[in-house]
Amino acid sequence: MHFDLVDMRLFVAVAEARSITHGAERSALALASASARIKGMEAALGVPLLERQRHGVRLTAAGESMLEHARIM
């Protein structure tokens, strides 16, 4: 599993905004690209990082752990 700096910065932005849309905007990425990157991270890890809700997202336990590691980078 390999994530680049763009992936990690995007994940932090999404987690802090609690929104893929706003995280994508903060990262200067198209929504479709940001969503695909997050889904790719989840697929590579084999666990969901986000719980997608009607209005935004919430971090799963795995997402909380990933956020700690992503902030270090």
Regions found by a protein language model. Give the residues of each.
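C-terminal effector-binding regulatory domain of bacterial HTH transcription factors
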Residues: 1
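The N-cap/first-turn positions of alpha helices
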Residues: 4-7, 31, 63, 70
